[in-house]
Amino acid sequence: MCFLRRPGAPASWIWWRMLRQVLRRGLQSFCHRLGLCVSRHPVFFLTVPAVLTITFGLSALNRFQTEGDLERLVAPSHSLAKIERSLASSLFPLDQSKSQLYSDLHTPGRYGRVILLSSPGDNILLQAEGILQTHRAVMEMKVNHKGYNYTFSHLCVLRNQDKKCVLDDIISVLEDLRQAAVSNKTTARVQVRYPNTKLKDGRNSFIGHQLGGVVEVPNSKDQRVKSARAIQITYYLQTYGSATQDLIGEKWENEFCKLMRKLQEEHQDLQLYSLASFSLWRDFHKTSILTRSKVLVSLVLILTTATLSSSMKDCLRSKPFLGLLGVLTVCISIATAAGIFFITDGKYNSTLLGIPFFAMGHGTKGVFELLSGWRRTKENLPFKDRVADAYSDVMVTYTMTSSLYFITFGMGASPFTNIEAVKIFCQNMCVSILLNYFYIFSFFGSCLVFAGQLEQNRYHSIFCCKIPSAEYLDRKPVWFQTVMSDGHQQTSHHETNPYQHHFIQHFLREHYNEWITNIYVKPFVVILYLIYASFSFMGCLQISDGASIINLLASDSPSVSYAMVQQKYFSNYSPVIGFYVYEPLEYWNSSVQEDLQRLCSGFTAVSWVEQYYQFLKTSNISANNKTDFISVLQSSFLKKPEFQHFRNDIIFSRAGDENNIIASRLYLVARTSRDKQKEVIEVLDKLRPLSLSKSIRFIVFNPSFVFTDHYSLSVTVPVLIAGFGVLLVLILTFFLVIHPLGNFWLILSVTSIELGVLGLMTLWNVDMDCISILCLIYTLNFAIDHCAPLLYTFVLATEHTRTQCIKSSLQEHGTAILQNITSFLIGLLPLLFVPSNLTFTLFKCLLLTGGCTLLHCFVILPVFLTFFPPSKKHHKKKKRAKRKEREEIECIEIQENPDHVTTV
């Protein structure tokens, strides 16, 4: 190996160049030996992967389990909301107070919920009798368990004061309306106010979550209701932590959903939408059931595309079965990874649907690159040497890209990831990448060895029979010549490589390369990139987090229908926020009262403190000290029927003869708009800091906070860590690769593709949830997988001009890139027909990933690389210097030998 020093080049530059050359040659030598090993022992490398697949695949069938805890999967694993839940539950058990802590979709425990929606223009309050009939049907519904019949009254959550079932207050309002209708009174006699209304027993009740689509009486100071479109009723079940009770509750929920479907057929004037505690999990898992057949269709499409794109008219050099076997190689590696996952007690969830597509996109890239590497080898070499040369040419880059896949998804599986679904996905993806790499160089490499042996012995690539001689073919019909032709007629004197006749390679060489490097095309490509960058930047400014669980459910499921109706008619108020004062407080102190009022300002409050202050004022009672305050509270206020329910909101302690209030709770409800979730997160972020700055020590909690607390940060951390990891690896290897500009261009290309996918998916109404984040991590690797070979071939090319270098790069790697991206995109098409929000997100993100990568590899990079470094002039100068030196030597020889001139 000889290294010539440039004039003026420092010694360190020489050493770095030597180190890069040694590393590159060392890796190529290792891959060459690996190829020789595989070519000499193909049966062994074919058998071992097959045995592994059979072993782990069969084990997976016996251990298949699904994940039933949705909170564990999609809620942030470590959040302040979970700590607040633990503290709040230690003070006031959540199972007893879940009726007060209303939450849209994340109510804890078991329950049944129904929305009754009237026809457009109708007032649902005038249909009280029909709604109460539905209510009575629920109350009388029975479920059988071990010979005993259970009704709602056996399973319901009981009130502490009278041990009756906890029911929504809207039921009491409807009873009053029905009685008024029966007694021929006008509905004006029953005053329904919104959001707070006064019940018959004297209580003030918040019904903002039970009455929807409200139209108030114009100019009404007391917020009287003129009409309403929807009513929401929730039936809360008690579980007691018993497995038997939980089983009975599950049966009751199933019967409840069946009853709602039956009642919908009977009540044509009302639309019924039901929800139960298991509905979200059922509709989340439903995506997997809906996708089964579509995944098989996707596999068939990829197999067909790979087979056709690997074919040629030349029956000797065509490799259709290698394309098919390459896809099957990736499939069995995925099956092995799934077996390992289930053997290690993994539980399946619908987010893992992306792994086959992710692994296929990377695995088939290695398959097509090996096929292209085989075509670039010399035909006159033995097939074992050709396999080794193909490994030496391809496996270095494939090893590097596989390592980056492992690093990025390994970082996603690290403890820094706060979403369990993302962590599980990344762990499985790491295993899939390792097995993918092993199966490509072993199983598919063995298939390549057998195919090479058939080609060397001149066997037909499809029928595996000997190819007749040219003289024999000339005497046969045209159809026989077409089927059995080995391409001897197509090969001309100026084109000695028969593989140049592959239709993709021929198209790129003869048509596309000349067109894309045309000087008149380049301005339009620059304009196209500016448009691409503008839309991407515009989308990046509109990113929104996807904390809503609806993004992961089947789109035609009852849960999604319920959530849409709920969002439309019950979005005026946030979920009920529990305001827990967990330290003793001087409630009788005027400054404390002012602080409480200031904290509760802007909220609709359901507060014992506010009601008590009003009671003292109305009764003209003075309670300015601790003794009077607590005495009147216990002996008078809490004993009145309309205030007895506040007993559950205060914790008293007795020290000697003195009573103390050690903790209490209030309920706050914020006014919201259609974007309820975002506004609730803003309210939470504003209230929490106040608990540290104010003299009142409190926490705020609602069950939905567990799913939304810092979700946007939790979900974006994996892609940020993965991106940082890729950037760090590329920077650290800046001086180890054969040309540093290759890494520089790779960083720019990957950044452009990543930001393009991020911006365009936002414009396509894709939120930042766990699925889109996983796709963004994959985009980093997919871009590197396809851009790296193209860029490194370009920077190492020694042609005279950049245009010739990019043509050479496209001719060398363009076929494999186009084959892989085309197969990848065609394989995504069946996902479009799965009625699921999860698969819609997966389809959109992966389609943008493939599309943006294709755009950069075949349009943007071929044009931009002709404008910017690396310059190819020094190669031209070197060749001119060598030619000039050779001419001078020839002249000297002529001068020294005059006889030669005379002879000539």
Curated annotation (Swiss-Prot):
One of its GO terms (cellular component) is membrane. Its main location: membrane. Glycans are attached at residues 149, 625, 820. PROSITE patterns: SSD (PS50156). It is a multi-pass membrane protein. Residues 291-450 form the SSD domain. The chain crosses the membrane at residues 41-61, 295-312, 323-343, 351-371, 394-414, 431-451, 523-543, 718-738, 744-764, 771-791, 823-843, 845-865. Keywords: Glycoprotein, Membrane, Transmembrane, Transmembrane helix. It is found in: Membrane. It comes from the Eukaryota. PANTHER family: PATCHED DOMAIN-CONTAINING PROTEIN 4 (PTHR10796:SF15), PATCHED-RELATED (PTHR10796). Belongs to the patched family. Could act as a repressor of canonical hedgehog signaling by antagonizing the effects of SMO, as suggested by down-regulation of hedgehog target genes, including GLI1, PTCH1, and PTCH2 in PTCHD4-expressing cells. This is Patched domain-containing protein 4. It comes from Mus musculus. The gene is Ptchd4.
